[in-house]
Amino acid sequence: MPATNARRWVPDVLRDAGEDDTVVYTVGVRASLDPESWSLIFMECYDAEDEQNISLGMDTYCLVVGPGQWTVYGGVVECELSDDRLILRLTERAAEKLRTPAEMGFGLALDSTKLEVLRRGLRRVLTSGRANAVPQRLVV
């Protein structure tokens, strides 16, 4: 497989989800319980009114893919969550920054508690910050 395609790999199934609200609210999913496994973290906008954040385009939610800590602000066009599937469509720019495909579909192997954490967290994070960065389609 060419290196350019290798950087676009994402897991088929996500098996863990969690949230943290100590400083900035985050919700994340990962491929396994292994702390080094592939992960996707959604961070709520911290200060949408800050002039520097606005000038840098950091006045909205943030996504981080690990390992590697690839980061982008905004960029989710569509997000759809069901009991067993998470579908994301990103802008090409966001996908390039995160080293992921622009369209991703994940199977979910989450219990009902973790699924509710993810549902609540995605709704909270993806509607934070600049209004024009909110996904055009958000079904959670």
Predicted region positions:
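Extended Gly/Ser/Thr-rich low-complexity repeat segments
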Residues: E36-E49, K97-D111
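A short, structured beta-strand/loop element
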Residues: L81-E96
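Short polybasic amphipathic segments
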Residues: V27, T60-C62, L86-R89
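Acidic, aromatic-enriched beta-alpha/helix-loop junctions
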Residues: S37-E80
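Charge-rich, low-complexity N-terminal segments
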Residues: M1-L40
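Mixed-charge, glycine-accented linear interaction segment located at domain edges/termini
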Residues: L98-V140
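A short, structured loop/turn motif at beta-sheet edges
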Residues: E80-D84, D111-K114
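A broad structural signal for short, well-ordered beta-strand segments within beta-sheet-rich domains
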Residues: R7-L14, P67, T71-V76, L118
